[in-house]
Amino acid sequence: MKKLFASLAIAAVVAPVWAATQTVTLSVPGMTCSACPITVKKAISKVEGVSKVNVTFETREAVVTFDDAKTSVQKLTKATEDAGYPSSVKK
């Protein structure tokens, strides 16, 4: 029992170390006017774990920096889709 408790305690301390800040570029082709990036940025910014968002109308892209322990790319793309702007990871 003590070994189990010790293992869980170590895992709880080390788990945050496994989390990493990631940056992903999303393609958002549905942005058709200069006001669209504002909506996309607001939607992505509301996702927990997002630390930085830069949306560019000219390239129809959103560059997002986030904590992968708190959110995922799927949650980011869902946020843009829910705002009316489907997106995908730019290859």
Swiss-Prot record:
Residues holding Hg(2+): C33, C36
Source organism: Serratia marcescens
Quaternary structure (record): Monomer.
Function: Involved in mercury resistance. Acts as a mercury scavenger that specifically binds to a mercuric ion in the periplasm and probably passes it to the cytoplasmic mercuric reductase MerA via the mercuric transport protein MerT.
GO cellular component, one term: periplasmic space
Highest taxon of source: Bacteria
Subcellular location: Periplasm
Protein known as: Mercuric transport protein periplasmic component
InterPro entries cross-referenced by the UniProt entry: Heavy-metal-associated_CS, HMA_dom, HMA_dom_sf, MerP, MerP/CopZ
PANTHER family: P-TYPE CATION-TRANSPORTING ATPASE
Keywords: Mercuric resistance, Mercury, Metal-binding, Periplasm, Plasmid, Signal
Lineage: Bacteria, Pseudomonadati, Pseudomonadota, Gammaproteobacteria, Enterobacterales
A Pfam family per the record: HMA
Assigned protein family: Belongs to the MerP family.
First and last residue of the signal peptide: 1-19
Coiled coil regions in record: none
Gene name per UniProt: merP
GO-annotated molecular function: mercury ion binding; mercury ion transmembrane transporter activity
Domain HMA, chain residue ranges per copy: 22-88
